[in-house]
């Protein structure tokens, strides 16, 4: 399958500070791909280089197809109406308006409101609609559900999955690890300007090692314990609580979340 995006030996520096140190990765056509990294890791710079919003020093970037970019914030005029913005973007892209897409995102339901009157969720939907004008092949989403309530998040997740089912390639930047784990086929983690990991969430788990988290609720409070030997640790904890005559109200065990594995990789620095 032809890659939607290829990044080869990408380097970018600001003065003497090397932000991207020759990173390589590919994004397959039709996948949802997340680019992650703590502040200062180079994630935003990498995305802006791929989107064509920032110049890079050396390397090569290939994007196969048209791009659509949904930014986290927008500089739309406060008093512009959603359909006015849609018509402007359609004119700039020299394309027809896709009424079915607008209906799916609920844009016509808010067409009489001014931008300043829209809720966070409505603005997110409008930003996505503007990114989809011109029927792009590759769509960049920057924190698409930030500030949304649960219903709004689930609705937008459904829209993203629908785009994938249409063969679109989605590049997602998010600080919400649960969202990434739910939506994405693969993830890349940037650390100090290098790609520390690129693969699936389960491959990340294998990379950092299987960790278990024991959550114990007692009358004194809740505590979580991390271990790679669940049986011995659980027996030891229960014996200790029994000796202290502490009554256990509830015990839960899980294998850890993507966020916990992400933190572990950052702690290791690799």
Annotate each language-model stretch with its function.
Residues 139-143:
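Catalytic Walker B motif of ABC-type/P-loop ATPase nucleotide-binding domains
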Residues 51:
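Helix-to-loop junction immediately C-terminal to a conserved catalytic motif
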Residues 203-270:
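Short, charged/small-residue-rich alpha-helical element at the C-terminal edge
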Residues 198-199:
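ABC ATPase "signature
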Residues 87, 96-111:
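Conserved ABC ATPase "signature" region
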């Amino acid at each position: 399958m032809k890659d939607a995006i290829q990044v080869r030996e990408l380097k970018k520096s600001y003065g003497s500070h090397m932000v991207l140190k020759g990173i390589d990765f590919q994004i397959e056509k039709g996948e949802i791909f997340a680019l992650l990294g703590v502040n200062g890791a180079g994630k935003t710079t990498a995305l802006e280089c791929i989107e064509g919003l920032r110049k890079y020093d050396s390397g090569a970037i290939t994007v196969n197809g048209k791009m659509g970019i949904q930014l986290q914030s927008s500089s739309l005029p406060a008093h512009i109406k959603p359909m006015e913005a849609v018509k402007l973007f359609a004119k700039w892209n020299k394309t027809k308006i896709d009424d079915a897409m607008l209906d799916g995102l609920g844009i016509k339901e808010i067409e009489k409101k001014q931008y300043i009157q829209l809720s966070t969720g409505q603005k997110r939907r409008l930003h996505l609609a503007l990114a989809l004008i011109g029927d792009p092949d590759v769509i960049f989403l920057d924190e698409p559900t930030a500030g949304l309530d649960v219903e709004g998040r689930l609705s937008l997740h459904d829209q993203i999955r629908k785009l994938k089912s249409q063969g679109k390639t989605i590049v997602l930047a998010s600080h919400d690890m649960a969202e990434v784990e739910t939506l994405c086929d693969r993830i890349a983690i940037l650390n100090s300007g290098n790609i520390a990991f690129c693969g699936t969430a389960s491959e990340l788990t294998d990379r950092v090692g299987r960790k278990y988290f024991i959550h114990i609720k007692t009358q004194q409070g809740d505590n979580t314990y991390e271990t790679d030997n669940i049986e011995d640790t659980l027996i030891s904890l229960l014996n200790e609580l029994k000796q202290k005559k502490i009554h256990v109200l509830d015990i839960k065990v899980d294998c850890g979340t993507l966020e916990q594995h992400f933190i572990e990789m950052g702690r290791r620095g690799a």
